[in-house]
Design a protein with these regions (language model features):
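A short, terminal or domain-edge coil/loop segment
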Residues: 6, 16-30, 122, 152-161, ...
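Active-site nucleotide/adenylate-binding loops and adjacent lid/helix of ATP-dependent enzymes
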Residues: 72, 82-225, 263-267
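Coil-to-beta-strand transition motifs
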Residues: 169-171, 180-186, 279-282, 295-301, ...
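A structural signal for short, well-ordered beta-strand segments
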Residues: 100, 174, 287, 306-308
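A long amphipathic alpha-helix within ATP-dependent nucleotide-binding catalytic cores
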Residues: 210-297, 343-372
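A generic structural signal for short coil/turn motifs at secondary-structure boundaries
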Residues: 138-140, 256-257, 315
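Conserved N-proximal alpha/beta basic substrate-recognition cap immediately N-terminal to
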Residues: 15-126, 136
Length: 373
């Protein structure tokens, strides 16, 4: 096998899929995707989780009690919340934040001028990150490397956009919670995010290499769309080709269980940052950092995003973990969300109504239809 997904390099060999036609390889990839639960579509994976949430709703006498877990975030961060407003709540943790600015809807040329002025004022150079202010699962996130790409993104976006400093390095997801009244919170989960990298043999095209890999073939449709302009190129032998840039599982990143990176130093820093956000108790920090050593020491970190109640402990997508492991973690996660919501309800926080939650979901889906891939 000529490739490696930043996990383990192996010697090149001829794969079964290399002998297949392009159509057959695509069919093989889609079929293999169904055999690995981490790639299942939401409608197949989430029914047991939804059933457990319904059970918790009966037990705690509120279907939407989880929305009270984070009183400072609309609907607790269930859907459609402003990422920019959340980062604003973390201003007391400014050393841990990259420069970010919000480009409201408006005339594209005016937005471009605003973006250029923001970059000038903050001393930012390309690349920068653009993403919808309300977004989930990496939808609409782009790394732009030129003024032309920036202009193209803004010309095709009719929604509020966050322009953020690009932070190089490694990426981690840190799931945190704190029961109201407790002096300290807890790091519940850490996910190491790896970008898929192919080790090329100098003989096959990028498309053939993607189809030859046991894991990459499961997401071949997505990888080929993201690399359409070079899919028929033959990279040099030994060349490493990174397939995606965004650290989201459904967009091709590899997620690994990072439990061994949790240290007292890391927990102390995360807890201090979380408690600077009054009314936040439950969610996941997405963090960029120069190295694993820096991360474990809780230093040189930048929080690129903070997600609320619909965050997942994404280490469950580690290929080593079973479907049973994933459900066990998610059930515990949702139980904690309901427990925190119950405590906050007793202190006067009102859960979002089912009607308002459905309305927010419909509005987000309408907005997200216009997001670039």
């Amino acid at each position: 096998m000529p490739l490696a997904m930043e996990l383990d390099f192996v010697q090149p060999r001829q794969s079964f899929t290399s002998a297949l036609s392009r159509g057959s390889r695509n069919f093989f990839g889609r079929s293999k995707r169904w055999s690995r639960w981490e790639f299942w579509p939401p409608y197949l994976f989430y029914p047991p989780v939804v059933a457990y949430i319904a059970y918790l709703g009966i037990r705690f006498r509120s279907w939407t009690l989880f929305t009270a877990a984070n009183p400072a975030i609309p609907a607790g961060g269930f859907v459609g919340e402003s990422k920019h407003q959340i980062l604003d709540h973390l201003k007391d943790a400014a050393p841990w934040l990259p420069f970010s600015g919000l480009l409201e809807c408006g005339v594209p040329t005016h937005r471009l001028a605003e973006a250029k002025e923001f970059m000038r004022r903050q001393g930012l150079q390309f690349p920068v990150v653009l993403k919808p202010d309300a977004g989930q699962r990496g939808a609409g996130v782009a790394i732009v490397r030129s003024l032309e790409q920036l202009n193209e993104y803004l010309m095709n976006s009719s929604f509020p956009v966050i322009l953020q400093e690009y932070v190089p390095g490694e990426e981690y997801g840190v799931f945190y919670y704190r029961h109201p009244g407790d002096a300290r919170g807890r790091v519940f989960s850490v996910t190491e995010k790896r970008m898929p990298v192919l080790l090329c043999d100098g003989r096959r095209t990028l498309e053939e290499l993607i189809h030859a890999d046991d894991r990459a073939v499961c997401m071949s449709d997505f990888y080929l769309r993201k690399n359409l302009d070079r899919s028929q190129q033959v990279p040099a032998p030994g060349e490493r080709v990174q397939l995606v840039e965004i650290g989201t599982h459904c967009r091709g990143a590899i997620f690994l269980d990072g439990v061994d990176t949790i240290t007292s130093a890391l927990e102390e820093v995360i807890d201090r940052i979380a408690q600077s956000f009054d009314g936040f108790f439950f969610g996941r920090f997405d963090i960029r950092v120069p190295s694993r050593q820096d991360f474990m020491a809780g230093r040189n970190m930048k929080i690129v995003e903070l997600n609320g109640v619909t965050s997942e402990a994404t280490h469950i997508y580690d290929p080593k973990l079973s479907l049973f492991d994933a459900y066990r973690v998610l059930f515990e996660q949702w139980r904690i969300a309901f427990e925190i919501g119950d405590f906050n309800r007793a202190r006067g926080t009102r859960p979002t109504s089912v009607t308002d939650l459905l309305k927010a979901t419909r509005e987000y889906r309408r907005l997200a239809q216009g997001y670039p891939e």
